[in-house]
Amino acid sequence: MGKIIGIDLGTTNSCVAVLDGDKPRVIENAEGERTTPSVIAYTDGETLVGQPAKRQAVTNPENTLFAIKRLIGRRFEDEEVQRDIEIMPYKIVKADNGDAWVEAKGQKMAAPQVSAEVLKKMKKTAEDFLGEEVTGAVITVPAYFNDAQRQATKDAGRIAGLEVKRIINEPTAAALAYGLDKQGGDRTIAVYDLGGGTFDISIIEIDEVEGEKTFEVLATNGDTHLGGEDFDNRLINYLVAEFKKDQGIDLKNDPLAMQRVKEAAEKAKIELSSTNQTDVNLPYITADATGPKHMNIKVTRAKLESLVEDLVQRSLEPLKVALADADLSVGDITDVILVGGQTRMPMVQAKVTEFFGKEPRRDVNPDEAVAVGAAVQGGVLAGDVKDVLLLDVTPLSLGIETMGGVMTKLVEKNTTIPTKANQVFSTAEDNQSAVTIHVLQGERKQAMYNKSLGQFNLEGINPAPRGMPQIEVTFDLDADGILHVSAKDKQTGKEQKITIQASGGLSDAEIEKMVQEAEANKEADKKFEELATARNQADQIIHGTRKQVEEAGEALPADEKAKIETAISELEEARKGEDKEAIEAKIQALMAAAQKLMEIAQQQAQAQQGSAEAGAQSQEDDVVDAEFEEVKDDKK
């Protein structure tokens, strides 16, 4: 069995790790970085991922996609998506199935399809390090992701050519990374995970019994639309408002200017974690009839904190709920772990310290812990890590809609997964021949306020008075937190089963098509790389041959020189084309034509060597042996 890699597919940055021997190791990407920006850019005929995509964002804002994780598994009509439409420089569009898709270079794409590009880069990073093909992966998701978002993340993995062995929750992965090598008995930890786009809190108990460590999630809570991007947006809005106040120009209608402001805001936010004041200085941000305009705004840490105070406060509410669900108080928490880049903000650290009454641990890398934990889980699944048991939970309750628009829960939130639950229901009317099973996820009693995961019909029920037929509904929640539902008429034995796919979501056929497109692109990328290599080789040989022709001078016969010049011209012509084989053939032809040149170069080198040796010998012959005598100076 090949290695199973661990991937933290983040909103802002992604990270990949693998078990190297018995120790998890974060793998550096082609740019030498341990994390990769989750940014994808579409340019003419090329897809850029990571730092190269981020670098060109200012000049290509409409086709540079970032924070796609905020859209994954979401409907276009969702309130959060509508909020993002206002602030994203790229187009968010409604797909035929009602999902939120994006548009770049005139092409509509599903969020999993775009996220797959980041996963492909993570896969390639791991393959370059391991020197072998990688197919298996553990991918992390926010603990508070619903069924549709988990399913969409698995789809992204499939499109990237990965077999997703397990989807695990980010805080749980961080706990694995933290607790694996910690000795000293049982502990209860709180993982506060504030990333680029999502927030989670998980209360996890680590028990050690006879050498086996059990990581049991007691409760989880969060907000899948709260993160560093929101902090950035507060600062962006402030900078734009200040500029408008000062210059009377609204930058919001200028995508290029907004992209520059976005980059500057992110940089300023990071700087303000270690300094009390910074300058946002953007020369030539825009221009009007009076000439170019420059942005130069001082931002203090206090100002930034006042802009985001309510966001930090918003993250504290789920902490209270999670503790209550786990039936614990803050005094029961042994350690607090901070995960996610946004937790580097001093105000966030101060509020968490104040809430728990203790300083968070400093020995966990907030950017890498999640990927490291995913790699550990990969090792567990591959059988390389023994004595570790992970017991995760479902973040939200699951149930079906029953008479009067009520949600009847079959699986309560914070139930350990995998789990199975069933309940018997009946008909609401006399002689009803079919029932609709409407599957819901959420905590509200009114069905309409919960997330609809899908619905299906069970038909062929024998006519009977209402309340008589017995319909058994079974919920089977797997280890990835994905739901499978079946309904069975106990009298006739008729059964209907489905794996819940959101009323939107991608069908198997759509995923397959995207997988094939990704494969085709892979082939095209490979051909492009081979062609570029052949062209580079041609350039080197042309340059080297011309230099040798020059050095040979009169020693090269005119007919040989003409032959070489012709071969060079033909290679230059082939190099302009797209045919790798033709370039390689002309390279061989030039090398054959330059055979005489090689001989002359060899003869010249030998002649030079001979004359150098002769010169050295004659110098030796001219040496005069002399005797020195000491001259004493008698002068006093």
Curated annotation (Swiss-Prot):
It holds the Pfam family HSP70. InterPro entries: ATPase_NBD (IPR043129), Chaperone_DnaK (IPR012725), Heat_shock_70_CS (IPR018181), HSP70_C_sf (IPR029048), HSP70_peptide-bd_sf (IPR029047), Hsp_70_fam (IPR013126). The keyword Methyltransferase does not apply. GO terms for molecular function: ATP binding; ATP-dependent protein folding chaperone; unfolded protein binding. Induction: By stress conditions e.g. heat shock. Residues 600-636 are annotated as: Disordered. Residues 601-618 have a biased composition (Low complexity). The keyword Transcription regulation does not apply. Residues 619-636 have a biased composition (Acidic residues). The modification Phosphothreonine is found at residue 198. Keywords: ATP-binding, Chaperone, Nucleotide-binding, Phosphoprotein, Stress response. It comes from the Bacteria. HAMAP family: DnaK. Acts as a chaperone. Belongs to the heat shock protein 70 family. NCBIfam families: PRK00290.1 (NF001413), PRK05183.1 (NF003520), prok_dnaK (TIGR02350). This is Chaperone protein DnaK. It comes from Vibrio vulnificus (strain YJ016).
